Structures are given as C-alpha cells and as structure tokens.
Amino acid sequence: MALKKKPVTGMKDILPREMEIRNYVMNMIRETYGTFGFSSIETPCVEHIENLSSKQGGENEKLIFKILKRGEKLKLDEAKEEADLVDSGLRYDLTVPLSRYYSNNANELPAPFKALQMGNVWRADRPQRGRFRQFMQCD
C-alpha cells in the first residue's frame, strides 16, 4: 500500500517557518500572562466522555472525536448503545478540561487561581475553508 502524503482532511502539517512564528506568539502570550500572575498548566488531550458530553446533547456533542473502549472493556457483541462502546474522547476546547482540573486540584491551588493553558484541541465537525479539525487554543 502506498503512503498517503497529504494529511487527513481537516488537518495540516506545520512547516518550520510557521512553527517559528507560532513559538514566538506563544512565548509572548506566556510572558504577558506571567506578568499578571497566571500559572501555566497542562491537561490531558483525552477526557472522560461524560465530561465532554452535555446532558442536553446539542452542538458540542457533534464536536467530539470519540475513542472506543479497549481490550476487555470493548464488547462489540453486547453493545446496545454508544455508551457501551465509548468511554473517552479528544478535548474539543480547553474549558472543560480546565473545569475538571480545578475541581480535582482545588485544594492544592492558590486563591485566586489564574491559569494559562495552550494546547491542541480537536473538533469532529466538517472542515471548512480556513477551519481545521485540529488547532491550537489558548485558555
């Protein structure tokens, strides 16, 4: 099978010059936020599906790249609904992970807590001109 050279639809390669610009901008953001007392944090790109899904469904539900259960947890022949197959997903923004992070670590964080997070997010919606399925976000 021949190697497919182009990235998956909605994704893009970042060449060195663009990476230089991105790193410059990210460093400026870190420096500026640091001046105002913000601390850098990092959260996993994979979150529990319950945290990513809203109870009402809606638009956010359509954004989630869902990850199938693995190993013994995945029982295809017994699955009756999506919840039987999926237990996690890729974050579609940084706000949901920040909420989980704060909830989990509040006792160890200063008050007030000022957080800066920059990282990739993924959205499963159909890509359009100038919009990608994977992109960098700052929260």
State each model region's role.
Residues 1-139:
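TRNA-recognition modules of translation machinery and tRNA-sensing kinases, especially anticodon-binding
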